[in-house]
Amino acid sequence: MTGEEAGARQADSASKLYPEADVPSPSLGSAKDVKRWVRWVIPHRLSGREPVAMAARAQLRHGVGKEVGAIPSIWMYTLGAVGTAWNCKGEKAVHTALTLWARHQGSNAAPMHMVEAKGTPRSFGAAVRALAEKGRGDKRPEETPVFRRLSSVVAAPAFDALAHHLRGIVDLLEAAEMPMDYGLLAADLFEWQSPQ
C-alpha cells in the first residue's frame, strides 16, 4: 500500500469517527485558516485520554522534525483532508505547530494548548516571557536558557532551522507545564514564510 493509499484509508475511517458537519474548511491558504484549523483539530480530534487521541499524539510526536507529508498516518490532522490542493506554507505551518504541540503535551495531564489565559491570548511570546520570568531568579534576562534559545529562534535563517530551535523552547515549556495557543503559533509560522 502506498503512502497516499494509507492516508486516504485513514481519512475514510476518520470521517466515520468524526462528523464532518462540524469540521472547519480544511483550506490552509491563509494565516487565519491555519489558526482556525489548529484550534479546531486539537480539542476535537487530538485531546483526551481516548486510545485514538493518544495514538494520534504519539504519531504526531514521531513527526517532529520530519518533512511535511512524510508520515501518512498524520495526514488527516496536518493536512485536514487528503486529496485537496494545499498551500505549501499552510502545510508546513500546521505540521510544525501540531507536531510541536504533541511534543509539548507529552505526558502532561493539563492541556498544553490554551487559547487564552485570564482573558489574554496565550501567544508563543507570552508563554516564553512567562517561562523566562519564572526561571530568571537573580539572572539578567539574556543570561537565561530561554533567552539563548529564543535568540536562536529569532536568528533562524530557514524554516527547518526555525522549527528545530522552536523544539528547544517547547521542551522548556513542557517541563514547566506552561501552555500556549498553537493556533496562533501556526498563524505565525505561516506568516514567517512570507516576510514583508
What are these regions (language model features)?
Residues 3, 152-196:
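Elongated scaffolding segments in large macromolecular assemblies
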Residues 40-101:
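N-terminal interaction modules that seed assembly of large macromolecular complexes
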Residues 83-130:
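Aromatic- and glycine-enriched beta-alpha-beta binding-site module
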Residues 66, 70, 100-111, 127-130, ...:
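Amphipathic alpha-helical interaction surfaces
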Residues 2-66, 149, 168, 172:
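Long, acidic, intrinsically disordered low-complexity segments
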Residues 119-148:
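Compact, glycine/acidic-enriched structural inserts
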Residues 26, 48, 63, 86-90, ...:
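Conserved aromatic-histidine-acidic binding/catalytic patches
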Residues 72-76, 110-115, 165, 182-185:
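Short coil/turn segments at secondary-structure boundaries
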